[in-house]
Amino acid sequence: MARWQDVFESEPNFAAAVQKVFEAHKHKTIATLRADGSPRISALEVEFRGGEVVFGMMPRSFKAKDLRRDPRTELHSASVDSSEDDPMTWPGDARMSGRAVEITDPVERLRFIDDPSATYPFFVLDIHRVVRVHLDGDPPHLMVRIWEPGRPLRDAIAD
């Protein structure tokens, strides 16, 4: 299981840039899989706590049901537009994919949740991939930077 701390320890500048993009806005997007295998996109809040990427949700939410059935998921930061005059003002976006691991043990939950009586579904992300997309160069081009456990950070230029 790769934790956020693993990303931060191996590539601190990359991790800081990704975290900055995620923390710039309260609401993010999560992709889950419905029972029939079709994708579902939902809104949620994500936090970085205790070296983990963590998120909770309403007890009977569809996304919680999806993740309990199939934990594969992807989280996406908010995406905002650049200035019309200067595309380089675009802050970029980021995403993380992996498996959502539900934390049900009351003692373990206290590492992340302040209210011991909270019963809502709560997950940490077992990270398989982190991607940061931003503009770079002159003329600007889309730069895709990818982190995966045990592999060197790599860049791909999108044409």
What is the predicted role of each segment?
Residues 1-13, 80, 84-159:
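Charged, gly/pro-rich active-site loop segments
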Residues 5-34:
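Short, conserved active-site entrance elements at the starts or edges of catalytic domains
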Residues 12-13, 69-71:
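Proline-centered flexible-loop/turn and helix-kink motifs
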Residues 15, 60-61:
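Structural motif corresponding to alpha-helix initiation and N-cap regions
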Residues 21, 74, 132:
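Short alpha-helical functional segments enriched in proximate histidine and acidic residues
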Residues 21-22, 67, 112:
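A generic structural signal for nonpolar/aromatic side chains embedded in well-ordered alpha-helices
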Residues 23-25, 38-39, 60, 87, ...:
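Short solvent-exposed loop/turn micro-motifs enriched in small/polar/acidic residues
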Residues 25-59, 65-67, 74-79:
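Short beta-strand segments
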